[in-house]
Amino acid sequence: MWERKKQRGYEKKLRNEDDEPIRLPNPMVGFGVPAEPCPVFHRTLPEAAVGPPYFYYENVALAPKGVWSTISRFLYDVEPEFVDSKYFCATARKRGYIHNLPIQNRFPLLPLPPLTIYEALPLTRKWWPSWDTRTKLNCIQTCVGSAKLTDRIRKALEEWDGVPPMSVQKYVLDECRKWNLVWVGRNKLAPLEPDEVEMLLGFPRNHTRGGGISRTDRYKSLGNSFQVDIFILFLSYFLNEVFPISDSIIHLNIFYLNC
């Protein structure tokens, strides 16, 4: 009995250690991002990890502590590169990447995408209140805010003729940040449309439309997708030296590139 309790306590301790979040770099710019000054990085890969073949693995940055060490262990102990998509587009998306791709002479796909909400969604500027100081959207999720939620917000705002009190502002902004709501009219907020999410992530318009894919599934697939401009940055060496740039981007979590 004592041995079983001791074993359960040890297993619980291990789980608690693994559940501890990892410490992420700030700013989260990896080995360099467009328009951000950074030193020249050099890294030494383990001999077994030197390509070709080349590998690339992406996962959420805020994974439990044990996850990244486990992934690294199975991929030749290569350390992850952490990048936030807010340096590439108007939405934040903290991701980690374990890869053995070349990091020298990387370049972004041009033209650079819009980097602020106003640039990406210019029609929202007319209705954007001064007390909503967001310039970036939060991470794209697999679901969106409901019509009931936006209706509750509208009613809360319509109780006030001018600027609402701080308590109402806080309530509205908390929901805006949680669900990536944008202003589409006086006191009217709405979730992003699927084609707007596609644009923010770097996909062509209607990339997820049709073919039996429902609106809900479009949001889900985009929420689980990657940011194309970051993906292109990592592959830019090969796009420049080996392959021509293509509009077709293969959506994979892991791929091996033999060249």
Regions from the PLM with identified roles:
Residues 1-259:
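Conserved active-site and SAM-binding loop architecture
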